[in-house]
């Protein structure tokens, strides 16, 4: 690779997301990954619809996507980076470890197309830390720092 040239960006449709992530309905919260740059960054898409089960109770008269699910969408997008990388080192699982500085700025509602931007900011061994943002219509709706552990062993 020539100096100053970054590797080609990848894009993953839903079928490839399903091959990559272990999550399934109703907990798969990434519909597409429009950009994944090696083990550095990714942009995921979550198309929010009123048909999702959490909207039956959160809240029936004014549906709002729960903040914890926005964080989970961030974790799944970051997890895609980890799992892409893990293919080379063969860990069996990626664990979500921490959430720091989570902020929710605006509700995410049915009909929104949420972009999830994640960027690896630190790596120490098998623990990776990511800066994450959720964006709707060009505006930041949530942000958090999260960390994950790539593990070669299943828990007991």
From Swiss-Prot:
CDD domains: FabZ. The active site is at 58. Its main location: cytoplasm. Pfam families: FabA (PF07977). GO terms for cellular component: cytoplasm; membrane. Keywords: Cytoplasm, Lipid A biosynthesis, Lipid biosynthesis, Lipid metabolism, Lyase. SUPFAM superfamilies: Thioesterase/thiol ester dehydrase-isomerase. One of its GO terms (biological process) is lipid A biosynthetic process. Belongs to the thioester dehydratase family. FabZ subfamily. This is 3-hydroxyacyl-[acyl-carrier-protein] dehydratase FabZ.
